[in-house]
From Swiss-Prot:
Keyword annotations of the record: ATP synthesis, Hydrogen ion transport, Ion transport, Transport
Keyword Transport: yes
GO MF annotation list: ATP binding; proton-transporting ATP synthase activity, rotational mechanism
NCBIfam families, per database record: PRK04196.1
Function: Produces ATP from ADP in the presence of a proton gradient across the membrane. The V-type beta chain is a regulatory subunit.
One cellular-component annotation, GO: proton-transporting ATP synthase complex
Protein name per UniProt: V-type ATP synthase beta chain
Family statement: Belongs to the ATPase alpha/beta chains family.
GO BP of this protein: proton motive force-driven plasma membrane ATP synthesis
Pfam family, one: ATP-synt_VA_C
Classification lineage: Bacteria, Pseudomonadati, Thermodesulfobacteriota, Desulfuromonadia, Geobacterales
């Protein structure tokens, strides 16, 4: 450990958010540096790579206006997150600076933004139900504490509105201390205004990290890490159950690709860096529960699939790491269904651990199975209807077609209304009874 900062004025190249500094001694990967602009403003950076006496630095801010003789101070520290329960109800930018008009709270502790991985042997099984207020999730693809469940969307679909609905309506069905950590990446000014209004209407505790599209790209890589550091502190140091909602991971991965290109790294699939899988895992795997400790971190990241392609590297790699997916449908959106969740390709792999007696209702599994089965049959019969026409189908087939329509119109569609789990299941039972399918 050095006793003082080492200051260099040997910048050899500036490429976007990257600096190359020569004749540097005793630097280490991950070390935080401070760069001074000509106007006296300072900006932080991080050592990414060391080759001999040349150091590559990723700058957490603007590099325009920097000269080759700008002072670069190596601090011997790493990027730290200031943490305290007082951050609840606050809004920060991607560098953990307050943007809500209030000063920074007095930190109770500082922790590395990268966090500490949970020992696999210390992980507790994800279980217990988290109510989102959305029937397609709560009744049919249940979210449980400690799970990581992504939302797969497409360009033009209302993923923003779905995220806001979860943000405002999520809570623990059985009560308890519950906080939402909201991380928004690469927002347009319109989206920024929308989410700030949504945060102003929050009735539960929240901590928000908001990065706009016109802010430094590197902040899009920092914001999720700060958000997860905050979530881990509240969960494992304060015993709270925390839901981390990140939108949009596609913007995060695009930022990762942009920085990788500036570093002149060899590209992988679709130009994304080959380490994108491990980078995403370093975020997603911070969700979970720890044996013998109260609190949990549950993650709900939103992924916009480029070109509606679920095999694109971003949703593809996300699917390998996470425990299911909630899929938004363009067809349902065109029918006016909100939220447009297509329950057939959607899946919550841990649903069984969070439903049933003691969690939701003893008949939850049976109701969900019947709804799935009959809706899947009705959807399949729509293809036959397109060929032979409705008149050429049996009376039983026409009942299934009507059920599929009613399922989308009355069960999946709920507009801006919030439904609790009992209301969602009761609505499903009523639908089955109306079509005489409750025992089928």
């Amino acid at each position: 450990m050095r006793l003082s900062e080492h200051i260099y004025r040997t910048i050899s190249s500036i490429r976007g958010p990257l600096l190359f500094v020569e004749r540097v001694f005793n630097a280490r990967a991950g070390e935080i540096v401070r760069i001074v602009h000509p106007d006296g403003e300072t900006v932080d950076g991080e050592v990414l790579k060391i080759e001999g006496e040349t150091v590559l630095i990723q700058v957490f801010g603007e590099t325009r206006g920097l000269g080759m003789d700008a002072p670069v101070a190596f601090t011997d520290g790493v990027k730290m997150a200031p943490l305290s329960p007082d951050m609840i109800g606050r809004v920060f930018d991607g560098s953990f600076h307050p943007i809500d008009g209030s000063p920074l709270f007095v930190p109770e502790r500082w922790t590395p933004a990268t966090g500490q991985p949970i020992n696999p042997t210390a992980r507790a099984r994800p279980e217990e139900f988290i109510e989102t207020g959305i029937t397609a999730i709560d009744a049919l693809n249940t979210l449980v504490k400690g799970q990581k469940l992504p939302v797969f969307s497409c360009a033009g679909l209302p993923s923003r509105e779905v995220a806001a609905a979860v943000l405002q309506n999520a809570r623990l069905a059985g009560g308890g201390e519950f906080v939402v950590v909201f991380v928004a990446l690469g927002l347009t000014h319109h989206d920024y205004s929308f989410y700030m209004e949504s945060l102003a209407e929050m009735k539960t505790g929240f901590v928000a990290f908001v990065n706009r599209a016109d802010e430094p790209v590197v902040e899009r890589l920092l914001a999720p890490r700060f958000g997860l550091a905050a979530a881990e502190f509240l969960a494992f140091n304060r015993g709270m159950d925390v839901l981390v909602l990140i939108t949009d991971m596609t913007n995060y991965c695009d930022a990762l690709r942009e920085v990788s290109t500036a570093r002149e790294e060899l590209p992988g699939r679709r130009g994304y860096p080959g380490y994108m899988y491990s980078d995403l895992a370093s975020l997603y795997e911070r969700a979970g529960r720890i044996k013998g400790m109260a609190g949990s971190v549950t993650m709900l990241p939103v992924v916009t699939m480029p070109e509606d392609d679920i095999t694109h590297p971003i949703p593809d790699l996300t699917g390998y790491i996470t425990e299911g997916q909630i899929v938004l449908s363009r067809e349902l959106h065109q029918k006016g269904v909100f939220p447009p969740v297509d329950v057939l390709p959607s899946l919550s792999r841990l649903m069984q651990r969070g439903i049933g007696a003691g969690h939701t209702r003893s008949d939850h599994r049976a109701i969900a199975d019947r709804l799935y089965r009959h809706y899947a049959k009705g959807r399949d019969l729509r293809r036959l209807e397109a060929i032979v026409g409705r008149e050429g189908m049996t009376a039983g087939d026409r009942v299934m077609l009507d059920f599929a329509d009613a399922f989308e119109r009355e069960l999946i569609h709920q507009g801006s209304a919030r439904r609790d789990i009992n209301g969602s299941l009761d609505r499903g039972v009523e639908l089955l009874k109306r079509f005489s399918l409750e025992a089928a």
